[in-house]
Amino acid sequence: MIRFTTAGESHGEGLFVIIEGIPAGLTINSEDIDLELARRQKGYGRGQRMCIETDTVKVFSGMRHTVSLGSPIAMYIANKDFKNWTKIMSPTSVDSEVTPLLRPRPGHADLPGFMKYGVNDFRDILERASARETAARVAAGAVCKALLKEFEISIVSYTSQIGDVTADISSVEECKIWHDAEISCVRCPDAKASEKMIQLIKKAGEKGDTLGGKVVVVTKNVPAGLGSHTQWDLKLDGRLAQSLISIQAVKAVEFGAGTKLASLLGALSHDEIFYDVTRGFYRDTNRAGGIEGGMSNGEPIVVTCTMKAIPSLANPLHSVNLATKETAEAEAIRSDVCAVPAVGIVAEAAIAVELAKALKEKFGGDSLKDMKKNVNIYKERIKAL
């Protein structure tokens, strides 16, 4: 089974991730992981910290000469900003007192964590709750992307909305969508919408405010049959949704036509089935988003994630001082104005991990060679139907 765990605080010395279950024999280049980390850091509206950090990964175990061994892969990403936080974030005792944070931000983990863990300073909560943790997830996702690539499965994403500005890609060729998204500073393939998004982010920043939005993630060439209908926790869409909704500030996840299906009749809600000797079973529409009955159906898996506006505002909201219980402004903590473009990259990583996990559960194999053999046998059986 493929699984990963992360450790590290936002302003601590660094982030750690250990991923288990990757089959032996997979080539993983650290440069490819660094590329994914760099994609996560880009985007108009990111905060000053992105000028400090240049994330790169260091692999400590589980690989030899760029090839996986089948044992746990341990990776480390240094926080270059730690030099400015050594006293505040020291894991050992310090000589002088550190001023506690006591004015929780609405929408963040500050107050719930303060109550749950009984701390005296909610920095103990926010440091781990921070979206900085997603850098470790992106590293794990990059490893899983390398595995999926061996089976010609690819994951791409774009920004479809920021604030009240929505992209129109109805007239854009599919291959151009992904190209234009990568060269846009907000990862939006609609040039006109992209410029409006930039202006909107600029205005929000000037007001000390933040913005949310939506990203669309598409996974191509997923074989039919990943996931299962047999138990609630084996359903592929359920597993993907849990992974995606766990991303900081993501508040909704939709598959295919998503919430639009609420207003459609059944005849317009589902994807009719066709058959061709060359293509096999196929659909002319993809309202299901590539998953039916908790299983992949062979069509592209299409997911939309909605991200709320970041709760760290330069112009803080109303709050309460936890020590005095008096009215106060929430803590003003350095943050992004808009991180929607980055969420697309984190969502790609989350999906990569879950699909790699489902792929290995379906086809097994301690080595990549065995896994490929099993996949080929399965594809031949499907082709013969």
From Swiss-Prot:
Entry EC no(s): 4.2.3.5
Classification via Gene3D superfamilies: Chorismate synthase AroC (3.60.150.10)
Pfam families: Chorismate_synt
Task performed by this protein: This reaction introduces a second double bond into the aromatic ring system.
Annotated GO MF terms: chorismate synthase activity; FMN binding
Gene Ontology process terms (BP): amino acid biosynthetic process; aromatic amino acid family biosynthetic process; chorismate biosynthetic process
Positions with a binding annotation for FMN: 128-130, 248-249, 293, 308-312, 334
Top EC class for this record: lyase
Domain of life: Bacteria
Protein name: Chorismate synthase
Assembly notes: Homotetramer.
Cofactor(s) it depends on: FMNH2
Lineage: Bacteria, Pseudomonadati, Elusimicrobiota, Endomicrobiia, Endomicrobiales
Keyword Flavoprotein applies: yes
NCBIfam families xref list: aroC, PRK05382.1
